[in-house]
Each structure stands twice: as C-alpha cells, then as structure tokens.
Design a protein with these regions (language model features):
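Structural alpha/beta surface segment adjacent to cysteine/selenocysteine redox centers
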Residues: 28-115, 186-189, 193, 197-201, ...
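Charge-dense, low-complexity intrinsically disordered segments
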Residues: 21, 69, 73, 134, ...
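Local sequence-structure signature of Cys/Sec-based thiol-disulfide redox active-site neighborhoods
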Residues: 6-34
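Solvent-exposed beta-strand sheet faces enriched in polar/charged residues
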Residues: 17-19, 49, 164
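C-terminal cap of thioredoxin/glutaredoxin-like
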Residues: 31-39, 108-205
C-alpha cells in the first residue's frame, strides 16, 4: 500500500514574533532578512522580542542580568537596552539602529560599551542624549525582563533567533545573511509541527 502523500500548508503566517540578541551572528542573519522583507513591502506583522543570551547563562540562584544598575550592565544587555529604547520611543529609526547594532558587533568587532552604542545611535540620525535618557529611566530593562521571561515561560525559548507563531515557537539558524527567500521558506514550515528537529551534522564552509 502506497504511503499517503504529504501536503504542506504553505500559507505563511501573517504575524510572527522573532527573538534577537545583538551578540548572535545567526540572529543577525535572520533579522536582516526580516527587515529586508518588511522594507520590500511584505504585509507580515513582526514583533521584535529581546532575548538575553547572557541571562540564559546565568547560574541558578544568581540575580537576573536586568537587575544590575544601568551603568554596570553586561555588554549584551546594554545593547538590548539601547535597542529597546529606540524600538519603543523612536520606532521610525528602529530598523536602522537594529541593523547598525548588528554591524557594529559582527562587521567591526566592537564591544557594546556605552560609547560604541552612542556612536550607533548617532549614525542613524538619532539624538544620543535623548536615547540615553530613555535608557537611564530603566524602562527598557523592564521591557527586557518582561519579554524575555514571557518567551521562556510561555514558549520555552532558549536562544535566538526563535520565530513564534501563535503557540508554535521554532529556533532557526540561517547560514546566509538577509535572504528573504530563506525566510519565506522557513515561515512556510512554522505550522508543520510534526517536524520537530531537522539538523545537519556538518556546517557548510
């Protein structure tokens, strides 16, 4: 007896959330594709969700990274705090900041000290003092705490980038940067929950 033909539902979701941490090159690959798709006119609604890899490696019983005073933040958390300040208070500049922050780390090898992030802010035409004031309010850290915690508690997120569609959450590694076609193919598969893991045994060089 022939096996039943498998037909995939290739209707892409119309609304997704996607996690990020500026420290991760694979998050960069995915987010460049997401931003490119949106700038090309995609009607996909995207919620950009911060997820701290530094928090994910905090030992049990230790205080969470967002409880550190603003001036003593770990570098990755500091970058997320700046990104959230821009996302929530200067949304028209978020895409530019988002891509520039990834570039600062992964093209130029910069560590996310305050002066580096100030330069990223200035490079996208934002007022450095205005963004810094938002960071200093602590609101971005509150947003990070809430959104990271929800990602872990509700969807069991463990890394970036994770794409979330309804109750489904899938960790995806794109090997190339900014490929909208790769993004579309991955989004097509989000709802196919009978495929749980599909991992290559070697990394293409």
């Amino acid at each position: 007896m022939a096996a039943p033909r498998v037909t995939l539902d290739t209707d892409m979701p119309r609304s997704v959330a996607v996690t990020y941490d500026y420290l991760c090159p694979f998050a960069r690959n995915a987010h460049e594709a997401v931003v490119a798709a949106l700038r090309d006119g995609s009607d996909l609604e995207v919620r950009f969700v911060p997820f701290s890899l530094e928090q994910a490696h905090v030992e049990e019983g230790q205080p969470p990274v967002w409880e550190t005073p603003v001036e003593q933040l770990r570098r990755g958390v500091r970058a997320l705090s700046y990104g959230l300040a821009v996302r929530d208070e200067f949304p028209e500049s978020f895409f530019d900041f988002h891509l520039a922050a990834f570039a600062a780390r992964h093209d130029h090898g910069q560590k996310f000290e305050t002066d580096v992030l100030d330069d990223v802010v200035a490079s996208v035409g934002l007022d450095v003092e205005a963004v810094r004031k938002v960071v200093e309010t602590g609101r971005p850290l509150e947003a990070l705490a809430a959104e990271h915690t929800e990602a872990v508690d509700r969807w069991s997120v463990f890394g970036v980038p994770t794409f979330i569609d309804g109750d489904e959450a899938v960790f995806i590694r794109f090997m190339e940067r900014g490929r909208v076609d790769d993004l579309e193919r991955a989004l097509d598969l989000l709802g196919w929950n009978r495929l749980n893991e599909f991992k290559r045994t070697t990394i293409p060089r």
